[in-house]
């Protein structure tokens, strides 16, 4: 076998090949032609359909991807106060280090943007996707939904509220889950929300893939809002994100008003019940 140490192979500590990153993100690299000719995929090492790649910056690893919707989603989730992975537009000078200007311009001319977010895992903390946790529960005769409602109810219900507001039709078992302590294998709470490049759907009856029950995002959110302290006023007062059109923004505001009303109704009913008990 090879005589290698973790220090030598850890991707958290060692440089990444820029040519591979360029190919994964843009599908082309000036210095990677021999391998490019055999590759027919937009990404090489990470899940999902969007073109993406890991790029090392001065303060750590960043995921670069094509998807301007992430910017709008970040702004809305900021206003809602829901924990999430923050996306920013990628710096031009860093893109120019791995790809030629023509291919970067082609993406921008299509109306898209290249965005980035900092890695959320580390050598000390891993992420466990929900679908992997479900497999574990199936082998140990445990109800995964009972576990998550006890382990991290606020983030679980906030996710359902956020997905309805964003019209996110692509929340699934591979893009949400738990943090895990690598020292002892114990699960922590849910990691921040991410992966919103399929948000802002115009469909009204999007099925929820995070609920225990067969229901829509709307139905799941109406139930969930009573268990969260999500604030809707900041979204209702904020300016429309430049990445969204008027129609998409109107739907966001309509859903916020709807859930705010439901939240007030639940709070009123709880106050009435407490008064009656006294």
Task: Give the positions of each predicted feature.
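Phosphate/dinucleotide-binding and metal-coordinating scaffold of catalytic cores
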Residues: 1-168, 177-278
């Amino acid at each position: 076998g090879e005589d290698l140490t973790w220090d030598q192979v850890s991707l958290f500590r060692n440089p990444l090949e820029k040519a591979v990153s360029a190919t994964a993100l843009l599908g082309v690299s000036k210095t990677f032609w021999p391998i490019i000719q055999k590759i027919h995929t937009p990404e090489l090492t990470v899940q999902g359909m969007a073109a993406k790649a890991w790029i090392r910056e001065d303060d750590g690893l960043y995921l670069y991807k094509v998807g301007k919707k992430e910017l709008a989603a970040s702004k809305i989730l900021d206003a809602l106060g829901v924990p999430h992975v923050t996306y920013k537009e990628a710096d031009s000078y860093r893109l120019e280090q791995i790809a030629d200007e023509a291919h970067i311009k082609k993406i921008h001319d299509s109306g898209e943007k290249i965005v980035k977010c900092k890695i959320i895992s580390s050598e000390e903390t891993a992420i466990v996707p929900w679908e992997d946790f479900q497999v574990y529960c199936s082998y140990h005769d445990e109800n995964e939904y009972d576990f998550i409602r006890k382990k991290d109810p606020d983030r679980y219900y906030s996710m359902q509220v956020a997905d309805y507001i964003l019209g996110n039709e692509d929340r699934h078992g591979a893009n949400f889950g738990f943090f895990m302590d690598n020292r002892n294998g114990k699960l922590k709470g849910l990691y921040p929300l991410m992966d919103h490049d399929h948000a802002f759907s115009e469909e009204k009856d999007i099925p929820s893939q995070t609920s225990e029950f067969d229901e829509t995002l709307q139905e799941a959110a109406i139930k969930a809002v009573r268990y969260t302290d999500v604030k809707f006023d900041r979204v209702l007062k904020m300016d429309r994100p430049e990445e969204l059109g008027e129609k998409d923004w109107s739907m966001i505001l309509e859903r916020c008003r709807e859930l705010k009303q439901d939240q007030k109704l639940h709070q009123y009913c709880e106050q009435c019940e407490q008064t009656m008990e006294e």
